[in-house]
Amino acid sequence: MLMASDMNRAVSFYRHVFGFEELMVSDYWSELKHGDAIIALHGGYGGGRNPIPLTLEFDDVLAAAERVVAAGGKIIDAPRQREGEPILLGVFRDPEGNEIFITQYIGH
């Protein structure tokens, strides 16, 4: 679950940046779907860091990072490979302040 102080802004961000579809939207609770994944947005909060970050995987994490910035998100740690890990990993904050990991599997 992600927190949102502005539900319309939060729903728009995840729809336009990542292609999530709306299952339901209200001021205080919204559900979005992408493939088999569903995320919930809880409204009425000031946003902020979620204790367990959501991780989204992409075929092109660098393009995803560009979409994040274009839509008002902030890159905290640009996508890069960490030593010994088979992924590119980046961290950003959405416009509501939630911390999200973005990854791309690159093999061994």
Feature map (PLM): residue ranges:
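Vicinal oxygen chelate
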Residues: M1-S5, K33, G46-H108
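N-terminal beta-strand motif that seeds the catalytic metal site of vicinal oxygen chelate
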Residues: M1-V11, I38, I52-L54, Q104-H108
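Residue-level recognition of alpha-helix initiation/capping sites
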Residues: S5-D6, L23, D59, E83
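Short glycine/proline-centered loop/turn elements that form peptide/ligand docking sites
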Residues: R9-A10, D27-S30, E85, H108
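Conserved active-site tyrosine of GNAT-family acetyltransferases
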Residues: A10-R15, V68, G97
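Conserved acetyl-CoA-binding loop of GNAT-fold acetyltransferases
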Residues: V17-E22, G72-K74
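Conserved short beta-strand elements that form part of the metal-binding/catalytic scaffold
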Residues: E21-I52, E99-Y105
